[in-house]
Amino acid sequence: DMYSKSTAAMSTYAGILTDQVLSMLKGEE
């Protein structure tokens, strides 16, 4: 249903965002 689909999309998006932030922080060190 809509809710579980949007939740899955959000967790995927959050995972990608976290990954980008971590690699950005690593690059600045």
From Swiss-Prot:
Pfam families: Apo-CII
Keywords for this protein: Chylomicron, HDL, LDL, Lipid degradation, Lipid metabolism, Lipid transport, Secreted, Transport, VLDL
A cellular component annotation (GO) from this entry: chylomicron
Gene3D superfamilies per UniProt: Apolipoprotein C-II
Biological processes per GO annotation: lipid catabolic process; lipid transport; positive regulation of phospholipid catabolic process
Entry-linked InterPro entries: Apo-CII, ApoC-II_dom_sf
GO molecular-function terms, A-Z: phospholipase activator activity; phospholipase binding
Subcellular location: Secreted
Keyword Transport: yes
Similarity comment: family membership: Belongs to the apolipoprotein C2 family.
Described purpose of this protein according to its UniProt entry: Component of chylomicrons, very low-density lipoproteins (VLDL), low-density lipoproteins (LDL), and high-density lipoproteins (HDL) in plasma. Plays an important role in lipoprotein metabolism as an activator of lipoprotein lipase.
Protein name, entry field: Apolipoprotein C-II
Source species: Ateles geoffroyi
